[in-house]
Amino acid sequence: MMKVLVVVALLVTLISYSSSEGIDDLEADELLSLMANEQTRKECIPKHHECTSNKHSCCRGNFFKYKCQCTTVVTQDGEQTERCFCGTPPHHKAAELVVGFGKKIFG
């Protein structure tokens, strides 16, 4: 009977040790993921800055993520180039205006 108790105690100890290592690995993975998210948050392109070379990296605004808006620019030589900047699309501006107005009315 004593041998069975010793074996059971040993198994419980091994299982708890291996599960705690698994949890530590999980926490390390979560930490790395959070650090990667923070780094991408730092690398986003602010409002009114150029996003011609990286159109999907605009930062978030108050309610929505800014969109890369492009226009065609004609230089003095007659050459056409595309220039893009991060900005708020008109329908997002309208939604922000309605939400702001609602906050003023309803507090």
Curated annotation (Swiss-Prot):
One Gene Ontology cellular component annotation held by this UniProt entry:
extracellular region
Question: What is the protein name stated in its UniProt record?
Answer: U1-lycotoxin-Ls1s
Query: Where is this chain primarily localised?
Result: secreted
Q: Does the keyword Signal apply?
A: yes
| Domain of life of the source | Eukaryota
Similarity remark: Belongs to the neurotoxin 19 (CSTX) family. 04 (U1-Lctx) subfamily.
Present the record's domain note: The presence of a 'disulfide through disulfide knot' structurally defines this protein as a knottin.
Q: Where in the cell is it found?
A: Secreted
Q: Which Pfam families match?
A: Toxin_35 (PF10530)
Q: Does the keyword Manganese apply?
A: no
- Residue ranges annotated as propeptide are 21-41
Q: Which GO terms describe its molecular function?
A: toxin activity
Q: List the disulfide bonds.
A: C44-C59, C51-C68, C58-C86, C70-C84
The residues the entry assigns to the signal sequence are 1-20
Entry keywords, A to Z? Disulfide bond, Knottin, Secreted, Signal, Toxin
In which tissues has expression of this protein been reported?
Expressed by the venom gland.
